Regions:
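Short loop/edge segments at beta-strand edges and connector loops
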Residues: 113-114, 162-164, 293-295
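Helical element adjacent to the flavin cofactor pocket in flavoenzyme catalytic cores
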Residues: 131-190, 194
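C-terminal catalytic lobe of FAD-dependent flavoproteins
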Residues: 283-379
């Protein structure tokens, strides 16, 4: 997320420095699946998040073209759409309920019979009772996205320090003044905290103002399809939250577990079994495909599973974290919103419900009275 914000700010003429704890573009975005599923992922209670997601989805085609031109790297934006399948009658009943809810929000979705779904995806298990198709929920190759953003920021003149984690944000006179890294101390007019699942690991920030972000572990794997006869065209969502994402290079990405296990990066037998069994129940012919890669990523989950965008409650310290499962989808709108906030002190209307201030509690009063921080205000 930090790279996209840096790119937008550099385009506006701002001098920007990015500090990455690893190799640029190889954090949570590298471990993701690249789904831009604003419609089919929407659940009751997420109406405000849907507004933000739809705006970002609207921005994505132009964002992709602009980034490819700026970096010289294709990010393989694909618009075949997303299919959610039901494998049993119970699945179909639940899917119908979700479909009706999503349609009530004005989302463009189509209910497919099992036969219609199999005409579109012949390798689906015979006898499935139904599916939902969203032609607006696209995908992007997230690893190429990370590489393209890293190249774009370099070409835009951003100073990019890799394998250089920020240890501490310097806060003096109730405002952020700079950062401490292995390089030493660097002053800053504004600090944007976009550290994903590691956002609470940054020192110097009063505990009352640390973002309530935790790592949510996800195990994933990739299978190798025949390039001449790929098994799937659409992104495929499964009844219990798994998904299959076909890539043009022949990989079939299978994801992803959702585990509250801190930063445990081990692949487990149970995790692999869950992924493979879920995929096999929908597309039995995957049993013939070789496994070519397994990996673990950490989604940055907030207390309400929605992002934190804007004022931290400390002057000149801005948050862009907590995107959970929607980091790739929300990249364009986050980059635009945070760059606008840095430059004008205001968020776009669609981002206003997601300020970190919604989590500030009574401890802020004590911090303000002690002089560590000031009351939240826009720049």
């Amino acid at each position: 997320m930090g790279l996209s914000i840096a790119w937008r700010l550099a385009q506006c003429g701002c001098p920007v420095t990015v500090y990455d704890r690893g190799e640029a573009g190889r954090g949570a975005s590298w471990a993701a699946a690249g789904m831009l599923a604003a419609a089919v992922e929407t659940e009751p209670g997420e109406e405000k998040l849907l507004t933000l997601a739809l705006e970002s989805q609207r921005l994505w085609p132009d964002f992709a073209r602009e980034l490819e031109a700026a970096s010289g790297i294709s990010i393989d934006y694909r618009d075949e759409g997303t299919m959610v399948v039901a494998l049993t009658r119970d699945d179909a009943e639940q899917l119908r309920f979700t479909y009706e809810f999503q349609k009530s929000l004005g989302l463009e979705l189509d209910w497919l019979s099992g036969a219609e779904a199999r005409r579109r995806e012949p390798h689906l298990r015979p006898g499935i009772p139904g599916a939902v198709l969203s032609l607006r929920d696209h995908q992007v190759e997230n690893r190429l996205l990370g590489s393209a953003l890293a190249e774009a920021v370099r070409r835009a003149g951003v100073m990019l320090y890799e394998h250089c984690p920020v240890h501490e944000v310097d806060i003096a006179s109730a405002r952020a003044c700079g950062v401490v890294t292995d390089r030493g101390y660097d002053r800053a007019d504004v600090v944007v905290l976009a550290a994903g699942a590691w956002s609470r690991e940054i020192g110097g920030i009063p505990r009352s103002h640390l973002p309530p972000v935790r790592p949510i572990k996800g195990q994933m794997l990739a299978l190798r399809m025949d390039l001449e006869m790929p098994l799937l065209r659409h992104v495929m969502w499964l009844p219990r939250g798994g998904y299959l994402v076909p890539r043009r290079d022949g990989r079939l990405v299978v994801g992803g577990t959702v585990e509250e296990r801190g930063f445990d990066d081990s692949m487990t037998a149970g995790g692999l079994l869950t992924l493979i069994e879920g995929a096999w129940r929908a597309v039995p012919t995957i049993e013939e495909l070789p496994v070519v890669e397994t990996w673990v990523g950490f989604r940055p989950g907030s207390r309400d599973d929605a992002p934190m965008l804007g004022s931290s409650g400390i002057d000149r310290l801005i948050m862009a974290t907590g995107h959970h499962r929607n980091g790739i989808l929300l990249t364009p709108v986050t980059a635009g919103s945070i760059s606008a906030y840095v430059l004008t002190g205001r968020l776009p209307e669609c981002a206003e419900p997601f300020t970190p201030e919604r989590f500030l509690n009574a401890r802020v009063g004590a911090a303000v009275r002690s002089g560590l921080v000031t009351a939240p205000e826009a720049r």
